[in-house]
């Protein structure tokens, strides 16, 4: 029998897509504050179709499995409403070739918003007496808290009169002048949480009684 010869078949081997820029590795924010968008850049053979994206979130630090949370774009903005630690990654494929690549994990930590657990307490003090120290204690938040104490002659949050140099969690008011002064502190966090204010504490300095 004569030999039979098949038609020629061309097999085109192409490389998987390449992630040129990974998404931000980690970020830590307060609940309901801005989370930086996750973004990757990808390159590959343009003849094997458009890039398809599938973003996943995990509760463990792995780039497999998890819950599908976003598709069709190289960017994704993580949810900021639930406290916890979440791990995001994206799978990129080209449907014409079946080639795909998986990103590294981006860790997103959502912390509870800061609160003040100990508020400053006002008092009545005799002129030139030893004043009670005003103090605040906070919990939660992101980063190191910074403090600024304010004084006002009215029972309002007047931000026009910061007390110079008083940037700690405690403040001892002066008692060398008779009268009412209202104090409060504004606490800021370098991790992006919103500022919080203490309650207002009234320090009433009164004159010593005069014996007659």
Can you describe what each PLM-predicted range is?
Residues 15-25, 112-119, 207-212:
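Proline-enriched interdomain boundary motifs that mark the N-terminal boundary
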Residues 88-89, 183-184:
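Hydrophobic beta-strand segments within extracellular beta-sandwich modules
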Residues 9-15, 107-112, 201-207:
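Interdomain boundary/hinge segments at the C-termini of tandem beta-sandwich modules
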Residues 33-44, 129-139:
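A short beta-strand segment in extracellular, disulfide-stabilized domains
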Residues 24-30, 121-126:
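Short beta-strand segments of immunoglobulin-like
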Residues 1-2, 93-99, 188-194:
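Short, solvent-exposed loop/turn segments at the edges of extracellular beta-sandwich modules
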């Amino acid at each position: 029998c004569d030999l039979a010869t098949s038609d020629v078949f061309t097999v085109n081997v192409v490389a998987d897509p390449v992630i040129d820029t990974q998404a931000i590795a980690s970020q830590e924010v307060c609940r309901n504050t801005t989370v930086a968008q996750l973004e990757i850049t990808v390159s590959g053979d343009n003849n094997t179709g458009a890039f398809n994206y599938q973003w996943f979130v995990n509760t463990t630090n792995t780039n497999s499995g998890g819950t599908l949370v976003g598709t069709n774009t190289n960017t994704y903005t993580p949810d900021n409403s639930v406290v916890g630690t979440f791990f995001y990654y994206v799978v990129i494929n080209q449907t014409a070739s079946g080639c795909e690549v998986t990103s590294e994990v981006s860790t997103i930590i959502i912390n509870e918003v800061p609160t003040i657990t100990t508020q400053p307490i006002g008092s009545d003090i005799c002129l030139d007496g030893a004043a009670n120290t005003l103090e605040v204690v906070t919990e939660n938040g992101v980063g190191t808290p910074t403090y600024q104490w304010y004084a006002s002659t009215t029972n309002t949050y007047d931000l026009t009169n910061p007390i110079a140099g008083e940037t700690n969690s405690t403040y001892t008011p002066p008692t060398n002048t008779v009268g009412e002064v209202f104090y409060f502190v504004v606490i800021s966090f370098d991790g992006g949480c919103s500022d919080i204010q203490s309650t207002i504490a009234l320090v009433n300095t009164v004159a010593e009684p005069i014996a007659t």
